[in-house]
Each structure stands twice: as structure tokens, then as C-alpha cells.
Design a protein with these regions (language model features):
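N-terminal Rossmann-like or analogous alpha/beta NTP/dinucleotide-binding catalytic cores
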Residues: 1-105, 198, 205
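Alpha-helical recognition segments enriched in aromatics with Gly/Pro capping
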Residues: 99-102, 109-207
Length: 207
């Protein structure tokens, strides 16, 4: 069996969640006021406090790549920001929208009663502030591929493509496996339940 597996072509993907919104400011960062002023924005939309790269996200990505290169193994680096904004995820995002009800039936039983009331697989990126919004989506239009969300009493409509929204992480995890045809991903023991859930979502998407 091991001899057979050794002959199967494979790729190793390193994926950066650099479209995630900044939740808190690390203590060991210089010029931390830059980060404090950009809480909630994607890491790649925040200026680099080290002032070396175009964004904080790019700085982190470069550090990760340089670290991995020291081990002399081949890997493919992928950026969440790039894949969302360049439309690489668009077909999969459309699939998530098509399977919205199935995904909700998988996720909702795992949430508390209050969280169930506001949960949506999609997180809009506010066109006014640039922040990743963890707020209720009030309308979903599967035909036109749009969402409506309520931002402090103001209803905003957005389509789901090209980085105008991102997915909640468990759905995002499954969507990546679906997009890149991933058969195995390493994860820690603390993520076992999340991985089981994401696997169910991936199957719902059609993998």
C-alpha cells in the first residue's frame, strides 16, 4: 500500500487566511496604532506596521514563505485574498449559495440558540468601511447571486463574487477543499469536530 501511495502524484498547498478581519492587536508589533485603527479589516487591507510591504497580510505571508523555504520541500502558496478577488472561488461561492439550505442544516444544529438567529455562511465586506462584517444577512437572491445585509439600520446589497464577501471559516475550509480538490489536510486535535463538520459541507457541495 505504501509503495502504491508513493507513486501517486500530489501537491502540497500552504494557504493563508489573509482576508480574515483583524480581531485583536498582537502585543509584539511596532506602530500598533496602525492596527488599532484597522480592527475588523482584512489583513491585506491594513498597512504594514513594519513598513516593509504593502500590507500587514503581505508581511505575514512573506515571513511564512521564507520560514517554509528553510525546510527545502516543494509547496504551492495560495492567498485567500488573491483567490477571492481574482474570482478563483467564484464558481464555488455560487455553489455555496445554491446549497445554502443544505449547509445551514449542517451548521445550525451545532450552534447555540442566539447564534442560530444571526448565522450566515457569508460574511459581507462592507463597501463603506472595508471591514469584514459578522452581521445577519437579511435577504438571499440565488438567481441574481446577491445578498442584502443590515449594517446599523442601513440595508446594503452586494453580490457574492470577487472579494465582496467571504465565507465563515468552517464553510470556507470546505469550499477550499472543493475548489482545489483537496483529499487531505493536516489539523490539530482541537479542530477535529470542525474538520468533521467541514467534511460534511464539502460533500454537500458535491465532492
Amino acid at each position: 500500500a505504501l509503495n502504491h501511495i508513493n507513486k501517486i502524484n500530489s501537491e502540497l498547498i500552504t494557504f493563508s487566511d489573509d482576508l480574515d478581519g483583524l480581531r485583536k492587536v498582537p502585543e509584539n508589533i511596532p506602530n500598533d496604532k496602525i492596527l488599532h485603527n484597522n480592527i475588523g479589516k482584512p489583513l491585506t487591507s491594513i498597512p504594514d506596521p513594519f513598513k516593509k510591504y504593502a500590507s500587514f497580510g503581505e508581511h505575514n505571508n512573506k515571513m511564512l514563505i521564507e520560514f517554509l523555504k528553510k525546510f527545502n520541500f516543494n509547496f504551492i502558496f495560495k492567498s485567500s485574498t488573491e483567490n477571492y478577488k481574482k474570482g478563483i472561488f467564484n464558481n464555488s461561492l455560487e455553489r455555496v449559495l445554491e446549497k445554502f439550505d443544505d449547509i445551514m442544516s449542517i451548521i445550525l444544529p451545532t450552534l447555540g440558540s442566539e447564534r442560530r438567529k444571526t448565522y450566515s455562511p457569508f460574511l459581507p465586506i462592507c463597501p463603506e468601511t472595508g471591514k469584514v462584517l459578522e452581521i445577519p444577512v437579511t435577504e438571499i437572491d440565488k438567481k441574481n447571486k446577491t445578498l442584502v445585509f443590515d449594517n446599523d439600520g442601513k440595508k446594503i446589497k452586494t453580490d457574492i463574487f470577487n472579494g465582496k464577501c467571504k465565507l465563515q471559516w468552517k464553510v470556507d475550509w470546505a469550499m477550499r477543499w472543493f475548489t482545489f480538490d483537496v483529499d487531505f489536510e493536516m489539523y490539530g486535535k482541537d479542530l477535529t469536530e470542525s474538520a468533521i463538520l467541514s467534511n460534511k459541507i464539502c460533500r454537500a457541495l458535491g465532492k
